[in-house]
Amino acid sequence: MAPSPEGVTVVLGAQWGDEGKGKLVDILAAEADICARCAGGNNAGHTIVVRNDKGEKTSYAFNLLPSGLINPECTAFIGSGVVVHVPSLFNELDTLERKGLKVAGRLFVSDRAHLVMGFHQIVDGLKEVELGGSSIGTTRKGIGPAYSSKASRSGLRVHHLFDPTFPAKFRKLVEGRFKRYGHFEFDTEGEIEMYLAFAERLRPFIVDGPTFMHNAVNSGKRVLVEGANALMLDLDYGTYPFVTSSSTSIGGVVSGLGISPFAIKRVVGVIKAYTTRVGGGPFPTEDLATVGETLQEVGAEYGTVTGRRRRCGWLDLVVMKYSTMINGYTSLNLTKLDVLDGFDEIKVATGYKIDGVEVEGFPADLDRLAKVEVQYATLPGWKTDISNCKTYEEFPENAKAYIKFIEDYLGVKVQYVGVGPGRDQNVIIF
């Protein structure tokens, strides 16, 4: 199914990230006019593999740029809620163009997007060292410190690059970091010179962000929004403080792009058939024994950006119910179902108890969350290779039962099912 012809389609991560959003975005972007990023920075990441007419494969890595650029007819937009590390943006752009992807005239950046500077990245590392054993496990890309600058009203936005006061504002920001963290090695004047050079290269891409999106929506363009990270990493609704620094929920789409909530017609929640998490923080269904190791190995669970091993465990429907409540998914994309092919039995978390009392919702207090006793339902496995299934009817009955169990618990239909890493390994149910 294509993006909504009468509004905006949003793809959001429903767990702790790494659900496989990029693959669905890639598929939907084939029929989109505009693909937009609304939040986050180059801390997100996924790889798309494209096969040409000769059967040759080309791999494209996306971190900051919207992956809709794969479609030569699609325009990409980086919204006001994104934080942009300009050197990384052009490095990614140059890499894509060296692989034959023509981007000229198809990429636009909001003038209101905040900038990630080199000192933000240094500070990111210093903060992690300072936290020691309580570190959050960031990607050290400077995302958090850039959002901190934004929240404290001292950050620099894209349009500031063309302001004569940019060098003075930049120096003031660096001096503030020196006062906080001590004098670290940083070439302030060299960084200013580099950014002023980048500014001229960036100029053709810059637009008035809210006006760009308003015109797109009002002219009937098919808009696809590519969410970054996931709901459980949201600054307000995730497992705070083990979260990212932006709004990764449906609310972040509205504020990050400057669009009306009434423009959004479809919200697809992407949910992995089991659960993974990178870095520190609560993970009620984490399995540190055989199950977790099997999921990690079979699912090749290593972070796209950091290369870190992902923590693994059974699907947590308590998390998913909470995620669904906040984001209001109109349908689901269940990914990596094939990873469960080898299990005799599959467990699914259906509730939490603390001291024998059922917990309503998802606890905000991490001390309470650490005490939960996870309640599981056990479903029979299917012990069949489903990686070649092309239709829902081809799935084993127990795989269908697993999908239905999820649908019944959440009250949302599964629309897409991923059965392998390939673009063509995606079953569309409706």
From Swiss-Prot:
Pathway as given in its UniProt record: Purine metabolism; AMP biosynthesis via de novo pathway; AMP from IMP: step 1/2
Keyword annotations from UniProtKB, A to Z: Cytoplasm, GTP-binding, Ligase, Magnesium, Metal-binding, Nucleotide-binding, Purine biosynthesis
Catalysed reactions, semicolon-separated: IMP + L-aspartate + GTP = N(6)-(1,2-dicarboxyethyl)-AMP + GDP + phosphate + 2 H(+)
InterPro entries in alphabetical order: Adenylosuccin_syn_GTP-bd (IPR018220), Adenylosuccin_syn_Lys_AS (IPR033128), Adenylosuccinate_synth_dom1 (IPR042109), Adenylosuccinate_synth_dom2 (IPR042110), Adenylosuccinate_synth_dom3 (IPR042111), Adenylosuccinate_synthetase (IPR001114), P-loop_NTPase (IPR027417)
GO MF annotation list: adenylosuccinate synthase activity; AMP binding; DNA replication origin binding; GMP binding; GTP binding; magnesium ion binding
Pfam families attached to this UniProt entry: Adenylsucc_synt (PF00709)
Cofactor(s), names only, from the UniProt record: Mg(2+)
EC number(s) recorded for this UniProt protein: 6.3.4.4
Record bears the keyword Metal-binding: yes
Binding site residues for Mg(2+): 18, 45
Cofactor note: Binds 1 Mg(2+) ion per subunit.
Positions annotated to bind GTP: 17-23, 45-47, 310, 336-338, 418-420
SMART domains (UniProt xref): Adenylsucc_synt
GO biological process: 'de novo' AMP biosynthetic process; cellular response to cadmium ion; IMP metabolic process
Class of enzymatic activity (EC top level): ligase
Gene Ontology CC terms: cytoplasm
Residues holding substrate: 304-310
Binding site for IMP: 18-21, 43-46, 139, 153, 229, 244, 308
The protein's role, per its UniProt record: Plays an important role in the de novo pathway and in the salvage pathway of purine nucleotide biosynthesis. Catalyzes the first committed step in the biosynthesis of AMP from IMP.
Annotated family: Belongs to the adenylosuccinate synthetase family.
Oligomer status and interactors: Homodimer.
UniProt name for this protein: Adenylosuccinate synthetase
The species this protein was found in: Cryptococcus neoformans var. neoformans serotype D (strain JEC21 / ATCC MYA-565)
